[in-house]
């Protein structure tokens, strides 16, 4: 394969990757954990947070904090999995 063809292939792959990243940024992920619901987009921006009223207890805020951490971490993990699916494979360029 000559250099021009390799460069053209690399440019196409870059354009495809940018398109997929843009699509991922617009995608929404919904996570619900024991009364805590989070909606987060692929750009890792939280767009909605719902906390069931029963979880709001001034004497036990640690439980709510733990549930929020669990939900946030699961949301970020889902996005990372999607990012891994669209990441280019190093050997796909033929190197």
UniProtKB/Swiss-Prot annotation:
Where in or outside the cell is it found? Cytoplasm, Nucleoid
Q: Which UniProt keyword terms apply here?
A: Cytoplasm, DNA-binding
One Pfam family name is YbaB_DNA_bd
Any single Gene Ontology cellular-component annotation: bacterial nucleoid
Task: Tell me where the signal peptide lies.
Answer: none
GO molecular function terms noted in the UniProt entry: DNA binding
Q: Which InterPro entries does the record associate with it?
A: YbaB-like_sf, YbaB/EbfC
| Superkingdom of the organism of origin | Bacteria
Quaternary structure note: Homodimer.
Describe the task this protein carries out: Binds to DNA and alters its conformation. May be involved in regulation of gene expression, nucleoid organization and DNA protection.
Q: Report the sequence similarity comment from the record.
A: Belongs to the YbaB/EbfC family.
Name assigned to this protein? Nucleoid-associated protein MMOB0740
Species whose genome carries this gene: Mycoplasma mobile (strain ATCC 43663 / 163K / NCTC 11711)
């Amino acid at each position: 394969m000559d250099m021009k063809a390799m460069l053209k292939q690399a440019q196409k792959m870059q354009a495809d990757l940018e398109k997929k990243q843009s699509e991922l940024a617009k995608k929404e992920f919904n996570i619900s954990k024991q009364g805590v619901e989070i909606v987060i987009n692929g750009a890792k921006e939280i767009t909605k947070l719902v906390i069931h009223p029963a979880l709001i207890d001034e004497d036990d805020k640690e439980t709510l904090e733990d549930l929020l951490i669990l939900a946030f971490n699961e949301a970020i993990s889902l996005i990372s999995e999607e990012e891994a699916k669209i990441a280019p494979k190093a050997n796909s360029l033929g190197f």
